[in-house]
Amino acid sequence: MTKKTSNLVMAVANDNGNGWAKTYCQFEDGTGNTTITPSLYAPVSKHETIPDLEESNEVQDFNDNMDVLIKSPSLKTTSEYLVGKAAINSGNNLIDYNVEANLGKVTPDISMIMPLAKIAYAALNHILSVAKYIPTTININLAYYLTCLPISEFVNKERRKTLCKKL
């Protein structure tokens, strides 16, 4: 059964590590989950064919099959991305934190793409496990969002302000 809209209140703690993104999501009913995902994504080619999935009341390995379309003023673009293991398995060009570029965590798009994808998939998985349907729209109210910055960026007040503005 497909319902049009679901509304969720969540609290999220997210650590976008250079190699792995660790995310804890807690829902208003007290349930929560922790996921660990490779910190990388791959843009989806406009010519790429992605197989259709049949509607199901179960999402198997949702953390391994993230395919997201993100429209965000922080990214200044609307794009489709494969995230984590889905990106690795795609054969597409991978984008990760370029630690040698010395950009930090505030500037790169990956700092927004990873948590947005993980929050969306956690919300979908929660709705499927509790209500057993796939909504067309999920409205998420983040009551709390906690993230980490390297000390070198945290001590810089302007970098903190920039991250808050992006979020």
Predicted regions and their residues:
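Nucleotide/phosphate-binding catalytic cleft detector across ATP-hydrolyzing
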Residues: 1-18, 22-167
